[in-house]
């Protein structure tokens, strides 16, 4: 029986009305309702951003056929954004990859060959050969992996174990390096522990919201709906929005501030000065819970050492700091006067004062939100530190309705990249590879020889590009990310390395992305509810979901790929004799046996799954792999302020916010009565630091790595739009989302367009020192840049805006500044 949408809706209405009235139901309505009831519903977190909305997934006949907001989910309370409502369609693009593809010519691998279907065994044969050759000839530093904040928790954990323990290479980094690394380093420097102290429940209790470089209306729309409700329901609530261009979040703003790029550092120091000058310091909090330090300056821009800017820097890459007195700090910020700040930022004085008054008013609860405007910044760590200063000076932290809150852009940038520790320098639960004690903890838990994990920090994302280009990194596996489109400086620093004959590139992805098409081997990957998974969102909420359908064709999850590939290596092939001598019982064993099929991981039987429950990996291996990996991983954080609940609890709950102690989640960390790690009488305790005190840093304004000049006379900022997510590899395959925003445009001020003889709809060539792209002029619409700046989203594979961007990074976090480079326009 086929029905139109109208007939379907009408039949549902008839059935509902008849049931309410106690009447008999027409046959067609009964049939439709029966068909609807045949849909099986189960919970899952949304596949997109870091908000962590809960959805109900409807499956029927082996396919995801529907999706709705989960009314029991505390994050979104039944509401989805436009992307969330179309989640089912991301899985069924016409070009979905279903079998491995290898570049071949004359029946064998060839770097210049055509993509040819092969089997998984053939794919692993080629990978095994390339990995073993590189390891034998050049050692562990010649191989690398680029992962994702979209990995599930156990996928990231399995990948980290394989590289850091198995292959003894720390050259593994996630794409969260491009979005959250500055937040991580900022948290660690100020508090000694990563991730926000507050939660989304703050929204309903706050008096003021300040957005620093965050367009929440489009990038975190569900949270924005809660802020909007709070603002419109309470006339005394204030919203301030700071950005380098006007966007949709300004529609709600009481104080909408456009500032000159990079000058947010000036504004932050001005507010600190205002707080001090107006005696608005919370003296009791400040005296008990805060230390003051002066940070190193002139630290460079994370460019190659041969770059003139790096050569000129006095302290390139330095995160050093020294204690300072309050009087010295007061004198430091005193330089950032209202007059100087207005001049440097271009912001009117009255707007600056209004903003400062929000923080200084002891009766106003303030939340600071930020995302990429802060983090993708050559002084992103400093920006994070400076906003913490404002909350630490006023004591507006770790209490309901108050606090600094770093929002995340990916569904598990927190839960996987940060908490699991898939960065090149990290291990689980905030541990790091450079700390011998931390390495020892991991090696003992993993039952591997002491000294297995290298002490040297591996290559971060941008350094991986450079090493590939230089021929130092020769085998490179990327998963769950599209870095050829998303990463900076494609022309100069990425594409050359990927297409270098010395290098072999593997891309695991569900679709033929820009990255996949630039690779040598493509592995088809299972998506979202085609596997069992777990994500951790921005408020420390860990959420689980079960596999609900099977992947098409031969597509396999990232977890399956990692675990099965580990079977190809024996310990003698990857570890030196001195390590094997410490644990001779591991001789002859495969990395699969050493890392995954261990007594610790394999102790949970498949029988724990319901008889009809899908779980392809566990049923193939004969034990509950996901549970074993999670419980082993969770051990690292329990008792250390990162406590995760038992595995089974998450399948019953709509997520739990860590630390979870004695079955109770934590909404606000570091404060007495809210955090189980803060004892009675302590008030506040920032227990990531040895003395329990947070740090206020004195850090100055320093200019951007590249700014407009006479030839390249415009700032370029890049970012996202509501309808698409990151590089659009999923959302552009949803017809409705594609139609809503079919191609990227160049947002430009009308006067800048007029001065260049450009009109709305014209084609325009955007040119930087590194490359050029053709786009379309947009002088109206949702984004309205000031004169001197243009904005372009990066979702469009036909307009690779990252051909233009500079690979300058924050020297401390190694995160790229995608918000500031110089371009010129040429009419086409």
UniProtKB/Swiss-Prot annotation:
Please give the biological process terms from Gene Ontology that the record holds: cellular respiration; Mo-molybdopterin cofactor biosynthetic process; nitrate assimilation
PROSITE patterns for the chain? 4FE4S_MOW_BIS_MGD, MOLYBDOPTERIN_PROK_1, TAT
This protein's superkingdom?
Answer: Bacteria
Protein keywords: 4Fe-4S, Electron transport, Iron, Iron-sulfur, Metal-binding, Molybdenum, Nitrate assimilation, Oxidoreductase, Periplasm, Signal, Transport
Location within or outside the cell: Periplasm
Q: Name one GO molecular function term.
A: iron ion binding
Which InterPro entries does this entry report, sorted A to Z?
Answer: Asp_de-COase-like_dom_sf, CT_Nitrate-R-NapA-like, MoPterin_dinucl-bd_dom, Mopterin_OxRdtase, Mopterin_OxRdtase_4Fe-4S_dom, MopterinOxRdtase_cofactor_BS, Periplasm_NO3_reductase_lsu, Prok_molybdopt-oxidoreductase
- Provide the E.C. number(s) assigned to this enzyme: 1.9.6.1
- Which positions carry the signal peptide feature in this UniProt record? 1-31
Any Pfam family the entry gives: Molybdop_Fe4S4
Q: How is the cofactor bound?
A: Binds 1 [4Fe-4S] cluster.
What are the binding positions for substrate in this chain?
Answer: 794
What is catalysed by this protein?
2 Fe(II)-[cytochrome] + nitrate + 2 H(+) = 2 Fe(III)-[cytochrome] + nitrite + H2O
Q: Which residues bind Mo-bis(molybdopterin guanine dinucleotide)?
A: 83, 150, 175, 179, 212-219, 243-247, 262-264, 372, 376, 482, 508-509, 531, 558, 718-727, 802, 819
Provide the 4Fe-4S Mo/W bis-MGD-type domain boundaries.
Answer: 39-95
Return the CDD domains for the record: MopB_CT_Nitrate-R-NapA-like, MopB_Nitrate-R-NapA-like
Got a GO cellular component term for this one?
Answer: membrane
SUPFAM superfamilies linked:
ADC-like, Formate dehydrogenase/DMSO reductase, domains 1-3
Say where the protein is mainly found: periplasm
UniProt family annotation? Belongs to the prokaryotic molybdopterin-containing oxidoreductase family. NasA/NapA/NarB subfamily.
Q: What is this protein called?
A: Periplasmic nitrate reductase
Q: Which organism is it from?
A: Escherichia coli O1:K1 / APEC
């Amino acid at each position: 029986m086929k029905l139109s949408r109208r007939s379907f809706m009408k039949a549902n209405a008839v059935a509902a009305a008849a049931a309410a009235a106690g009447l008999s139901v027409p046959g067609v309505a009964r049939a439709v309702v029966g068909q609807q009831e045949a849909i099986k519903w189960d919970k899952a977190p949304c596949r997109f951003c870091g908000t962590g909305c809960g959805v109900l997934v409807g499956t029927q006949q082996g396919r995801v056929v529907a999706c709705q907001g989960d009314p029991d989910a505390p994050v979104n309370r039944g509401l989805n954004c436009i992307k969330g409502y179309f989640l089912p369609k991301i899985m069924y693009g016409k070009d979905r990859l279903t079998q491995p593809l290898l570049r071949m010519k004359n029946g064998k691998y060839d770097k210049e060959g055509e993509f040819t279907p092969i089997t998984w065994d053939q794919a692993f044969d080629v990978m095994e050969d390339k990995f073993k050759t590189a390891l034998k000839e050049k050692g562990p530093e010649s191989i690398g992996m680029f992962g994702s904040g979209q990995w599930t928790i156990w996928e990231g954990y399995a990948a980290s174990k394989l590289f850091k323990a198995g292959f003894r290479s720390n050259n593994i980094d996630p794409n969260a390096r491009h979005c959250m690394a500055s937040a991580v380093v900022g948290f660690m420097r100020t508090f000694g522990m990563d991730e926000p102290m507050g939660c989304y429940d703050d929204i309903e209790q706050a008096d003021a919201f300040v957005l620093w470089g965050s367009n929440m209306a489009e990038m975190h729309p569900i949270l924005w709906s809660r802020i909007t409700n709070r603002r419109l329901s309470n006339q005394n609530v204030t919203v301030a929005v700071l950005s380098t261009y006007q966007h949709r979040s300004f529609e709600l703003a009481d104080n909408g501030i456009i500032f000159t790029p990079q000058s947010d550092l000036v504004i932050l120091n001005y507010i600190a000065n205002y707080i001090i000058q107006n005696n608005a310091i919370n003296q009791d909090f400040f005296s008990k819970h805060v230390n003051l330090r002066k940070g190193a300056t002139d630290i460079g821009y994370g460019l190659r050492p041969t770059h003139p800017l790096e050569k000129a820097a006095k302290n390139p890459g330095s995160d050093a700091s020294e204690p300072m007195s309050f009087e010295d700090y007061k004198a430091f910020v005193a330089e950032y006067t209202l007059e100087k700040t207005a001049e440097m930022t271009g912001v009117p004085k009255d707007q600056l004062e209004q903003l400062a008054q929000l923080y200084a008013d002891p009766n106003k609860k303030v939340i600071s939100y930020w995302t990429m405007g802060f983090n993708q910044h050559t002084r992103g760590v400093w920006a994070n530190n400076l906003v913490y200063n404002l909350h630490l000076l006023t004591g507006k932290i770790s209490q309901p309705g108050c606090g600094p809150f770093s929002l995340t852009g990916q569904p598990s940038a927190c839960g996987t990249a940060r908490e699991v520790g898939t960065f090149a320098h990290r291990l689980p639960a905030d541990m790091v590879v450079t700390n011998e004690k931390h390495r020892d903890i991991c090696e003992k838990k993993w039952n591997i020889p002491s000294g297995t994990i290298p002490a040297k920090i591996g290559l971060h994302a941008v350094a991986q590009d450079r090493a590939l280009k230089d021929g130092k990194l020769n085998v490179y596996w990327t998963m769950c990310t599209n870095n050829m489109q998303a990463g900076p400086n494609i022309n100069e620093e990425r594409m050359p390395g990927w297409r270098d004959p010395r290098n072999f590139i593997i891309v695991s992805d569900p679709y033929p992305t820009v990255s996949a098409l630039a690779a040598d081997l493509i592995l088809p990957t299972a998506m979202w509810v085609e596997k069992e998974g777990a994500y951790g969102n921005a408020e420390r909420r860990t959420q689980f979901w079960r596999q609900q359908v099977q992947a098409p064709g031969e597509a396999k999850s990232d977890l399956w790929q990692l675990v099965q590939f580990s079977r190809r290596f024996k310990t003698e092939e990857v570890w030196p004799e001195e390590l094997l001598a410490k644990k001779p019982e591991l001789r002859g064993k495969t990395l699969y046996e050493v890392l995954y099929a261990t007594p610790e991981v394999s102790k949970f039987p498949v029988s724990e799954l319901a008889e009809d429950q899908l779980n392809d990996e566990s049923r193939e291996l004969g034990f509950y792999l996901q549970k074993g990996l999670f419980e082993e991983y969770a051990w690292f954080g329990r008792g250390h302020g990162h406590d995760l609940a038992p595995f089974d609890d998450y399948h019953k709950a709509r997520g739990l916010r860590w630390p979870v102690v004695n079955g109770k989640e934590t909404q606000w960390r570091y404060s007495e009565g809210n955090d189980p790690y803060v004892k009675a009488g302590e008030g506040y305790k920032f227990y990531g630091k040895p003395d329990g005190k947070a740090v206020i840093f004195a850090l100055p304004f320093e200019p951007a790595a590249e700014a407009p000049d006479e030839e390249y006379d415009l700032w370029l900022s890049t970012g996202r739009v509501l309808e698409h997510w990151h590089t659009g590899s999923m959302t552009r395959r949803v017809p409705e989302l594609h139609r809503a925003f079919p191609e990227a445009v160049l947002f430009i001020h009308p006067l800048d367009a007029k001065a260049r003889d450009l009109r709305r709809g014209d084609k325009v060539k955007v040119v930087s020192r590194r490359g050029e792209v053709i786009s379309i002029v947009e002088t109206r619409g949702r984004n309205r840049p000031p004169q001197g700046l243009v904005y372009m989203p990066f979702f469009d594979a036909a307009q690779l805006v990252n051909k233009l961007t500079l690979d300058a990074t924050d020297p401390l976090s190694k995160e790229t500044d995608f918000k500031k480079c110089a371009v010129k326009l040429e009419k086409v």
